[in-house]
Amino acid sequence: MRSWGRDTFISLRGLLLVTGRFPEARDIILGYAATLRHGLIPNLLDGGRSARYNCRDAVWWWLQAIMDYINISEDGDEILQSPVIRLYPSDEAEYTTEVTQPLHEIINEALVTHLNGLKFRERNAGRKIDEHMTDAGFNNVIGVDPETGFVFGGNIHNCGTWMDKMGSSAEAGNKGVPSTPR
């Protein structure tokens, strides 16, 4: 099943929290927490095994959804102690279900990773996961400016924010060119 991290957490407040569907919201928050890798929530979940970590802002939408859950639901702060089975307990780990951590530790990992900066190449980089992206687009360098708190990252060959359309036309000359390169 394909599930989009950014879209999920942008809509979670309106679809689940303000409508009182707290158990569903909790399950989604914790389910995505299990997939954290490189300090990021995947933009494309794809069942957890072929997730794409090509989105700089999905993790921030996830964190906002957690704050909304805490503020809107009764006993919302209890979610911070909820156990999460980590599918990737480290950046280089293969898929596993042997490590369990409370949500608050995973939140901390995401924040510390961003503050320290992260640099990685997407797993399975190439046509198998994106038939239009150039090779350099699979390289990611992301961080947070400690002076401003602004998130930075990406390069002219990838699109890691909400305007993530990758050009696909050789005829038009935009194949492999993001509509909004960073």
Predicted features by range, described:
Residues 1-182:
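Acidic, mature catalytic/reactive cores of soluble proteins
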